[in-house]
UniProtKB/Swiss-Prot annotation:
Name of the protein this chain belongs to: Peroxiredoxin
Keyword terms, alphabetized: Antioxidant, Oxidoreductase, Peroxidase, Redox-active center
Any coiled-coil regions, as ranges: none
Family: Belongs to the peroxiredoxin family. Prx5 subfamily.
Length: 179
């Protein structure tokens, strides 16, 4: 569960709301780096196979959102959800979920996921390359806690979920032995 690994340096292509743009799509491109997300703070990063998928949309993302205040009370500055989806998909998913606290990171090309060693094929589901489900506690860009679902591998027939749940991570954060 504990490890000392620096997160890879990656640039993410994001879409951010811009009030100066009128019309139905008032967003502009903005590059954000891993430093923008992880430097100088202690965060939770959780990664999942895809936006709008059942476990991700029914349990994992909503539960992180609802437990946000509890995470803040336990020393977490921000919570990020990452998926190998583009910025348009991630923005639409966030809007459909009514997010107020959890921030979404689009890893459209899968570069971050690949450099973390978590890129898997999900061709059996028609997804292509996606992230294996995991979560991490990251302190100033260094992974200090690791929560990876069992069964890592290409075209896994199941979608394990539990180890990377917000409830499990919160329990670990509250434990005296956690870093």
């Amino acid at each position: 569960m504990t490890m000392e690994k620096q997160v890879p340096i990656v640039t993410f292509r994001t879409r951010v709301r811009d009030e100066s743009i009128s019309g139905p799509n008032p967003y502009r491109w903005e590059d954000k780096t891993t430093d923008d997300y992880f430097s100088g703070k202690r965060v939770i990063l959780f990664s999942l196979p895809g936006a709008f998928t059942p476990i991700c949309s029914t349990f994992q993302l909503p539960d992180f959102e609802s437990l946000y205040v509890e995470f803040k009370k336990n020393g977490i500055d921000d919570i990020y959800c990452l998926s190998v989806n583009d910025a348009f998909v991630m923005n639409a998913w966030g809007k459909s979920q009514g997010l107020k606290n959890v921030k979404l990171i689009p890893d459209g090309s899968g570069e971050f996921t690949r450099k973390m060693g978590m890129l898997v094929a999900k061709d059996n589901l028609g997804f292509g390359l996606r992230s294996w489900r995991y979560a991490a506690v990251i302190n100033n860009g260094v992974v200090e806690g690791w929560f990876e679902e069992e069964g890592f591998g290409d075209n896994c027939a199941t979608d394990p979920y539990g180890v990377s749940s917000p409830q499990n991570i919160l329990k670990c954060l509250k434990a005296p032995a956690f870093v």
